[in-house]
């Protein structure tokens, strides 16, 4: 009986180790005006940082040593307008170079005014 419990425990660990993490893929979405205009949607491999994923699918201009996105595909920050990003509907609290994507994640960049800190309409 003890051996069966141990085997079941080990099997559960192997199954859980395969969930999410660096396996599978994530989704990258780039929009403007709180999600009203979709500019890009792409699948990306899990395990990349949010910045690596964005740079694989779009032309990105950064500042502050590559930690802050200034422009995506030529759409650049302007007075009172910037790029904001979310992972799974939650606004990021750190640079995209520090956030590693897991399988099933949605990375969403939205170009918008600073007037409302809420997530874009239709956030995942």
Predicted regions, residues:
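Ubiquitin-like/PB1-type beta-grasp interaction modules and other compact soluble beta-rich domains
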Residues: 2, 18-124
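Sec-dependent bacterial lipoprotein signal peptides
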Residues: 1-18
